[in-house]
Design a protein with these regions (language model features):
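Single conserved hydrophobic/aromatic residue that forms the stacking wall/gate
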Residues: 199-211
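Active-site and channel-lining beta-strand-loop segments
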Residues: 24-45
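Active-site-adjacent loop/helix segments that line or gate small-molecule/cofactor pockets in enzymes
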Residues: 1-31
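Alpha-helical transmembrane segments of integral membrane proteins
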Residues: 195-196
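Generic beta-strand/beta-sheet core signal
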Residues: 38, 191-192
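PLP-dependent aspartate aminotransferase-fold enzymes
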Residues: 90-190
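Short, well-ordered beta-strand elements within core beta-sheets of diverse protein domains
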Residues: 34, 54-55, 168-169
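Glycine-rich loop-to-alpha-helix module at the N-terminal edge of alpha/beta enzyme cores
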Residues: 2, 42-128
C-alpha cells in the first residue's frame, strides 16, 4: 500500500462517520467488471455497488445516456412529469407485468414504501390499525427504521429498539413456519428471493405457495 493511499484512509477515518467496516483500499476507476485502486491494482468486482450496478464500468450506452441527460436536466422532483421517467416506467411495466411504477432512491426507501402501501391498503379495507407483516429470519432489508423492523437479524436491530410493531418472523423455504404466522390480521409477507446476508435462495415451489 502506497503512502498516498495510507494518507487517504487516515483522512477518511478522521472525517467520515464510522457506519461501515471498510476494506483498506481506495478505489479510483473502473473498466468492465474490474475496479482499480489509486495504486493501479486491479480487482474483479463481485460487489457491483451491492448488486445495484450490473452494467459494469465504462458501459458506453449507459455513459452516453447519462451525459446527455446531465446536459438537459438532472432533477425536477415528483411534482412534475418528465420524459425519462415516463419512458422508463413503460419499459419496466413491460418486463415486470406490473400495473404501476414507483421510483425511489434506494432499496430501503422501496421497503419503506412497500410497508406503508400494505398498511394503508389494509387500513382502508377495514379501518383497523393492528395489521401484521410477516418477514423472514436472517433477512436484511435496509437501515431505516421500517426496513430494520422487518430485518430478521437481531444484531442490526438491538441498538435501535423499539422497532415498529406487529412484525412477525418465519423461516425462508419453510412454508409451514410462514403459515403458522398468518392470521386474519396479516396484511403483507416480505421476503428476499435471495438472502444475500446468508446466501440463502428461495425454492421456487415454496415461493409459489407463498405467492
Amino acid at each position: 500500500m502506497s503512502d498516498t493511499m495510507k494518507e487517504y484512509i487516515a483522512e477518511a477515518e478522521k472525517d467520515l462517520l464510522h457506519t461501515y467496516n471498510r476494506y483498506q483500499i481506495v478505489l479510483d476507476k473502473g473498466d468492465g467488471v474490474y475496479l482499480y485502486d489509486i495504486d493501479g491494482k486491479k480487482y474483479l468486482d463481485f460487489v457491483a455497488g451491492i448488486a445495484v450496478f450490473a452494467l459494469g464500468y465504462q458501459n458506453k450506452a449507459y455513459n452516453d445516456a447519462l451525459k446527455a441527460q446531465i446536459d438537459k436536466v438532472i432533477h425536477t422532483s415528483n411534482y412534475y412529469y418528465n420524459v425519462p421517467a415516463i419512458e422508463a416506467a413503460r419499459k419496466i411495466k413491460k418486463v415486470s407485468g406490473m400495473d404501476r411504477v414507483f421510483f425511489t432512491n434506494s432499496g430501503a426507501e422501496a421497503v419503506e414504501g412497500a410497508i406503508k402501501a400494505a398498511r394503508k391498503y389494509a387500513y382502508l379495507k377495514d379501518g383497523c390499525t393492528d395489521h401484521e407483516i410477516i418477514a423472514m429470519n436472517h433477512s436484511f432489508h435496509g437501515r431505516t427504521m421500517g426496513a430494520l423492523s422487518v430485518t430478521g437479524n437481531p444484531k442490526y436491530r438491538e441498538a435501535f429498539q423499539p422497532m415498529i410493531g406487529h412484525i412477525k418472523f418465519a423461516d425462508l423455504n419453510n412454508f409451514q413456519s410462514v403459515l403458522d404466522q398468518v392470521t386474519d390480521k396479516t396484511c403483507a409477507i416480505i421476503m428476499e428471493t435471495v438472502q444475500l446476508s446468508l446466501i440463502h435462495i428461495s425454492e421456487p415451489t415454496r415461493l409459489a405457495l407463498i405467492s
